[in-house]
Amino acid sequence: MILVINSGSSSIKFKLFDTSKAIEPILDGLAERIGIDGFLKFEHNNQKYKFEDPLPDHEHAIQLILNKLLELKIISNIDEIKGVGFRVVHGGEISHSSIINEEVLQKIQESVKLAPLHNPAAIIAIKAVKKLMPNTSMIACFDTAFHQTMPQVNYLYSVPYKWYEEFGVRKYGFHGISYEYIVNKCEEILNKKKEHLNLIVCHLGNGASISCIKDGKSYDTSMGLTPLAGLMMGTRSGDIDVSICEYVAKQTNSDIFAITQILNKQSGLLGLSQTSADMRDVLEQYDRNDKKAIIAVEKYVQVVADFIVKYANYLDSIDAVVFTAGIGENADVIRDLICKRVKLLGLQIDQEKNESKYSDYKLISSEKSKIPVYAIRTNEEKMICLDTLNLIK
């Protein structure tokens, strides 16, 4: 069995995979409000469990998870868990999932300055598992690793080169675990080896990015040094004129940190619509002809369409355009509006297919479309499980 952990500052999402046959999760859970007034909940064999517990820290939460797995006889002993895979948001210039040793842990620590909200939580969880399961292999899967194949012309910024040399200022990109899963899935769907696949993948969730996949590898992506760059998102602004920060700071007697917080937490869909960061709420207002919701949706759609056209220019041919993540998988209206804005590529959506229910993936383009368009459900936890399994063999 493989345990997959995604650790946040006050929560731990986890899945337990049985890898003896098909690689499918047998348990899906969440430890939440760690350090406040916590609880643990999970689902196993269609039965839901919830346990109230103070959860003073991550180590206590992981200990409780393991205790409940044993108490409920989901596992008979800890050694049944052959590996633990961790999602780590930032790996700097690490280019692949890695067995966690002191060197890798140090590199994760060095990347804290690039992901101060995310990496510390991963480090805490890794150290807790190491203490509680000292004989179990641990693997770090990085959201940034997939994008390490980008050429320098795409990852360097036009700023003093010494900023890159001294401070690591460059585009890193994110959602790499999701993109890797989608590339593997497209290899299966399109029956074409991934080293020959050219894709434009739109990962549209509350955080959103697009990646240009050339010969199965990341060639460019919309997020940058941090996840703030690129597309308009739920609460993030995406790309803006950076001098806005200084201008608004002066106008409001704020500092750059305060303005950056606003760009991260109060912008995007929330900022423009003044309604919500959730696309479902914004679309409700859009249907009611709310002017701010309309401009928010139109801006969101336009920015995605612009990136699709930009990335199409990098590719000699395109095997598919893919929509994934919460909005990409579920918001048929947004998929349709985006494809209608991409005038140069001849994308044609079949409305019936686009609106139909599906489990894993579906083709949503019509026969007239010059390029196939798919909605594919991403599965980052399964990708982490597969990487963990491959590395511990």
Swiss-Prot record:
Sites where the protein binds ATP: 13, 203-207, 278-280, 326-330
GO terms, biological process: acetate metabolic process; acetyl-CoA biosynthetic process
Protein task: Catalyzes the formation of acetyl phosphate from acetate and ATP. Can also catalyze the reverse reaction.
EC number per UniProt: 2.7.2.1
Catalytic activity: acetate + ATP = acetyl phosphate + ADP
Single GO molecular function: acetate kinase activity
Phylogenetic placement of the source organism: Bacteria, Bacillati, Mycoplasmatota, Mollicutes, Mycoplasmataceae
Protein name per UniProt: Acetate kinase
Gene name tied to this protein: ackA
Required co-factors: Mg(2+); Mn(2+)
Chain positions recorded as Mg(2+) binding sites: 6, 380
Family classification: Belongs to the acetokinase family.
Pfam families membership: Acetate_kinase
InterPro entries linked: Ac/propionate_kinase (IPR004372), Aliphatic_acid_kin_short-chain (IPR000890), Aliphatic_acid_kinase_CS (IPR023865), ATPase_NBD (IPR043129)
Organism: Mycoplasma capricolum subsp. capricolum (strain California kid / ATCC 27343 / NCTC 10154)
UniProt: substrate binding residues: 87
